[in-house]
């Protein structure tokens, strides 16, 4: 029962934080690709031969096709349907990996970017706690509007952070 509840939380959380991360040209798609590549590499290190890794590659190819038209200035928008589909696919990938907790570091930038807003609203609605008031959410809005980052800087810097974390995951597994 507890595992089922945790699965629901993982899937719901992944869908919503990925959806909240959408909003800067290429950001959500690029971070999703980095996360999926991380799971792909981990699955190969763990020698998971169930065929799901092929689906991961297909999803990456689909997102690359989308990113071709979503690069700044975007000519194609993902919308809720696309970002939610990516979120559910990431959560299913985490579950299929056999180590759902790997979702946290593998998608840490998505979690922080989208999750901060969910946390802020939840604290206000449920407990009337007004912390994080000086932080705009999602986090990509904060760095663009309060720190002066351009859309491209935001996308590249967030991607670099996720690549570094993903490389650390792979390095730990290879040791």
Language model: regions and residue ranges:
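Alpha-helical transmembrane segments
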Residues: 2-7, 11-175
């Amino acid at each position: 029962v507890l595992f089922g509840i945790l699965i629901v939380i993982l899937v719901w959380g992944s869908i919503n934080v990925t959806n909240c991360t959408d909003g800067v040209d290429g950001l959500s798609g690029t971070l999703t690709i980095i996360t999926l590549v991380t799971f792909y590499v981990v699955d190969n290190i763990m020698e998971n031969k169930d065929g799901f890794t092929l689906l991961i590659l297909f999803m990456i190819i689909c997102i690359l096709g989308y990113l071709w038209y979503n690069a700044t200035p975007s000519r194609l928008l993902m919308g809720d349907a696309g970002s939610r589909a990516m979120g559910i696919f990431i959560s299913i990938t985490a579950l299929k990996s056999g180590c759902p907790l790997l979702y946290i570091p593998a998608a840490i930038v998505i979690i922080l970017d989208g999750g901060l807003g969910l946390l802020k609203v939840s604290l206000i609605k449920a407990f009337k706690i007004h912390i994080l008031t000086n932080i705009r959410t999602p986090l990509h809005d904060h760095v663009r509007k309060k720190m002066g980052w351009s859309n491209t800087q935001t996308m590249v810097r967030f991607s670099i952070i996720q690549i570094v974390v993903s490389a650390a995951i792979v390095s730990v597994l290879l040791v």
